[in-house]
Amino acid sequence: MPESSEPAPEIYRLPWPEQFRALADLAQDSRLKSFYQTGCIPADTPMAEAPLVAMDFETTGLDADEHAIVSIGLVPFTMDGIPLGQARHWIVRPRLPLHKTSITIHGITHSDIEKAPDIEEILEDLLDSLAGRIPVVHYRDIERRFLDVALRNRIGQGIRFPLLDTMAIEAHLNPDRRPSRWQRLMGKKPVSIRLADSRLRYHLPHYAGHNALIDAIATAELLQAQIRHHF
């Protein structure tokens, strides 16, 4: 494993476009350098004009230090549409063994990953798909953290990028989603901000979950609905 190098902490306090320029200078891997050199779209870009990419990972668990990515789904989109022909889906071989519980959840088996590439083998395509776009996820602690750890373990440097989190948006829109004990006794029910439940509030169709590409498409549709209804 390459020796990890960590940028100076003050870089992380810079605005994102300046962070990207600084991180491009520090990047030792050509694929990561190219990602940063593409740049970050300005913060004042109207949502109607923003290039976006929905991203979802299926993993062997929830702890990025103990578990690994097994599949990645990406789909570029804008507020005007989702070009499904440009979607990408990879099954990748984790360095850690699959657990029976994770196989039950995402359905990816040992035979599926036996000849699958390591994530480093698809890294150039993955970063090219993300470059110049704002990633959109449903629960940022999975995608950003797992990708950062995966890169640290392979090329010695992690990755940073701004993103939009549809789960965080739902949390903001439903501040009273966890009723008190008294409210529960009075019949008030909690509000789920899970992906499928959030989609139901916007009358979006039900999709089978735990497929990275399907969940990425579902996340793109959810953000479109959130923006149209609330912003």
Model-derived regions, located:
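Short alpha-helix plus adjacent loop in nuclease-associated cores
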Residues: 164-187
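Short Asp/Glu-rich motifs
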Residues: 122, 218-219
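Ser/Thr-centric signal marking residues that sit
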Residues: 57-60, 166, 219
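Conserved non-catalytic scaffold segment of RNase H-like nuclease domains
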Residues: 19-154, 158-160, 186-206, 210
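Short, conserved phosphate/pyrophosphate- and ester-handling motifs at nucleotide-, phospho-/glycolipid
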Residues: 215
